[in-house]
């Protein structure tokens, strides 16, 4: 969940513009109800963790507006005023396969403040809002990316075209032209988001009537459109692959600027498929909510006045409450409005992308009404919980290792190819599940083995005294399927193959394995992390269930370890199938 620091001075400025007194203590007490967990409130500002579904609260302007409705009962129309503009944006058909969703808007006359500090605060707030939307709704610019430009520096109409890698322009904050290829390879933003341009040989750019590049989405803007402290007229472009995310991003940026007095104008979009339309749309979304659903979820019946008041605090409007005359004769889904039942027609702002079902409206009604005002009653739904079939086996394995003096650990399921295979000399037995856009080189795939995670743990604790004995029972992923494995590792002087065999034998005994069915087979040299002649496969009923042994010093050195280590790893799924539970 994104955590933001909202400056008291900006919030005070926004509330003063609307005749509302800003009280940070009131925010601390009441704002968590609408998805704003207050982490800190100091002299500079208020730090708030925003729930993932409330992306409409990521800027000073939008959260201040929501607070006015929720805390001060200020009523706003769910319809967003958008004036019809005459600027045209034409999208070339080649864009369809590259970045198919293109939306734009114009905002004029934004009040960015009087003093230099107020103007600087505005620019900083706008940039932070843009990046938070990239991170959340935009899914790191994959679903949607936003460009904000100084309109006065541009010459409409605009065109969205595709160019090759040799096309050049001056990117934001640079002094000389760079080609598309150079930007993707050497510019910080280019390197960060180059993966979004994989497997294409044409790249999207937005140009004005003089063929000057405004934007190379989703990477970077052109330098000549840079927004400054004196910018009052804006062009906003949003491009991506998910139309719902793109529309929400565009409306939320427009809303922030409109809250500062800006007038939003639509543009005429001539899309790649030949469709002509005006965007953005400011009209609200209409939802039908059965009265039965409200009563079922809240445990009480609310009258029309109470519903209207509650939804108003969440930015919506109750249009009417009526008896259904046309619809199904029986209820098949919770949200169905049956003939003869009462339903409520509710309008919500289009930028509330988190509202996808009538149950979301019921949640907003509950928040507006106040959870403290709802009746207390025990649930009438009785649910019996039973253990998973595998939980008994997992519990017995952990108990056995703990009884042997091995501390239980839990590590990340994420790992990397070098740790999983190259360092420990295990072959990639099954198809690996890799991360398409890894943040670090250490976490590029989902692990197939657990032992490398334990060796990394011992490496991180190598400065502590010996012995160190650890085990982990966890999830691995092979061929896109979750499986369970257990591994142990002991860093101790004098512990060798005999110690490893002792631990393995004790575990199998505790699980109820028949010793006559257990076979110990020598591991071939360099097949796994073991010293030659000191590694073994454990076979039950002809099936290999695990390997144990003494680690080759060369393998230990790869993990930064300089002490003798004995270890092993078992396939828990195989153990469960081959060793019957002696208790059952």
What spans do the regions from the language model cover?
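Short, surface-exposed alpha-helix to beta-strand junction/turn motifs within ectodomains of secreted
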Residues: 22-24, 29-30
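Function-determining surface determinants
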Residues: 47-49
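Generic N-terminal amphipathic, Lys/Arg-enriched alpha-helix
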Residues: 4-15, 230
């Amino acid at each position: 969940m994104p955590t933001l620091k909202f400056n008291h001075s900006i919030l005070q400025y926004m509330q003063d513009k609307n005749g509302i007194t800003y009280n940070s203590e009131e925010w601390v007490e009441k704002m968590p109800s609408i998805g704003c967990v207050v982490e800190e409130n100091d002299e500079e500002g208020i730090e708030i963790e925003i729930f993932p579904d409330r992306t409409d609260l990521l800027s000073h302007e939008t959260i201040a507006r929501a607070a006015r409705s929720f805390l001060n009962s200020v009523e706003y129309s769910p319809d967003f005023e958008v004036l019809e503009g005459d600027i045209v944006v034409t999208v070339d058909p080649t864009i369809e396969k590259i970045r198919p969703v293109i939306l734009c808007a114009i905002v004029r006359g934004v009040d960015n403040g009087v003093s230099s500090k107020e103007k600087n605060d505005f620019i900083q707030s706008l940039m932070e809002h843009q990046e938070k939307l990239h991170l959340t709704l935009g899914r790191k610019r994959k679903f949607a990316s936003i460009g904000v430009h100084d309109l006065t520096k541009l010459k409409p109409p605009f065109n969205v075209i595709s160019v090759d890698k040799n096309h050049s322009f001056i990117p934001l904050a640079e002094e000389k032209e760079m080609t598309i290829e150079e930007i993707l390879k050497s510019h910080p933003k280019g390197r960060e988001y180059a993966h979004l341009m994989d497997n294409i040989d044409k790249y999207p750019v937005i140009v004005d009537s003089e063929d000057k590049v405004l934007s190379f989405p989703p990477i970077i803007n052109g330098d000549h459109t840079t927004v400054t402290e004196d910018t009052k007229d804006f062009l906003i472009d949003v491009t991506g692959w998910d139309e719902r995310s793109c529309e929400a991003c565009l409306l939320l940026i427009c809303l922030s600027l409109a809250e500062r007095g800006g007038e939003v104008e639509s543009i005429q979009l001539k899309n790649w498929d030949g469709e002509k339309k005006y965007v953005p749309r400011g009209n609200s979304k209409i939802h039908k909510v059965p009265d039965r659903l409200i009563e079922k979820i809240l445990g009480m019946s609310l009258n029309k006045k109470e519903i209207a008041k509650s939804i108003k605090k969440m930015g919506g409007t109750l249009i009417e409450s009526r008896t259904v005359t046309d619809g199904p004769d029986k209820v098949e889904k919770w949200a169905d409005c049956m003939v003869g039942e009462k339903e409520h027609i509710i309008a919500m702002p289009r930028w509330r992308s988190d509202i996808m079902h009538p149950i979301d409206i019921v949640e907003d009604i509950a928040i507006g009404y106040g959870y403290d005002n709802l009746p207390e009653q025990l649930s009438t739904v009785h649910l019996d919980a039973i253990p998973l079939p595998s939980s008994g086996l997992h519990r017995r394995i952990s108990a056995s290792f703990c009884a042997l003096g091995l501390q239980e650990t839990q590590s990340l399921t994420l790992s990397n190819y070098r740790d999983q295979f190259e360092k420990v000399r295990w072959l990639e037995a099954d198809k690996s599940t890799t991360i398409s856009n890894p943040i670090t080189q250490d976490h590029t795939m989902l692990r197939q083995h657990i032992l490398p995670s334990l060796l990394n743990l011992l490496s991180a604790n190598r400065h502590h005294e010996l012995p160190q004995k650890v085990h982990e029972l966890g999830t691995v992923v092979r061929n896109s399927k979750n499986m369970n494995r257990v591994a142990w590792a002991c860093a101790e002087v004098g512990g060798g193959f005999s110690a490893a065999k002792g631990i393995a034998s004790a575990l199998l005994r505790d699980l109820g394995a028949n010793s006559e069915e257990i076979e110990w087979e020598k591991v071939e040299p360099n097949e796994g992390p073991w010293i030659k002649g000191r590694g073994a496969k454990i076979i039950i009923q002809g099936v290999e269930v695990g390997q144990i042994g003494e680690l080759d010093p060369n393998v230990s050195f790869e993990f930064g370890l300089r002490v003798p280590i004995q270890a092993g790893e078992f396939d828990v799924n195989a153990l469960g199938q081959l060793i019957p539970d002696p208790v059952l």
